[in-house]
């Protein structure tokens, strides 16, 4: 299974991890300076869940993001799946 959420479309993103040194200006310092940057990946918070589908009358095992899980709690599984199908068409 990929690291992409099938319901929200969230996927890994590329970015940088910054190394800083110095004392912040609000702490009466000279300011924070970036001394290095390293490439890294930001991964979505993926969760494997077993959810009950009332339409199919069975459990569905899905690997979804945490934000998709909140969306399912708010709208219901069938509405979220229908919305994802409409988006992909």
Swiss-Prot record:
Source organism: Chlamydia abortus (strain DSM 27085 / S26/3)
Record has Ribonucleoprotein as a keyword: yes
Top-level taxon of the source organism: Bacteria
UniProt feature coiled coil, ranges: none
GO cellular component terms given for this protein: ribonucleoprotein complex; ribosome
Similarity comment: family membership: Belongs to the bacterial ribosomal protein bL28 family.
PANTHER family according to UniProt: 39S RIBOSOMAL PROTEIN L28, MITOCHONDRIAL, LARGE RIBOSOMAL SUBUNIT PROTEIN BL28M
The protein, known as: Large ribosomal subunit protein bL28
SUPFAM superfamilies to which the protein is assigned, alphabetical: L28p-like
InterPro entries with a match to the protein in the record: Ribosomal_bL28 (IPR026569), Ribosomal_bL28/bL31-like_sf (IPR034704), Ribosomal_bL28_bact-type (IPR001383), Ribosomal_bL28_sf (IPR037147)
This protein's UniProt keywords: Ribonucleoprotein, Ribosomal protein
Molecular function terms, GO-annotated: structural constituent of ribosome
Single biological process term from Gene Ontology: translation
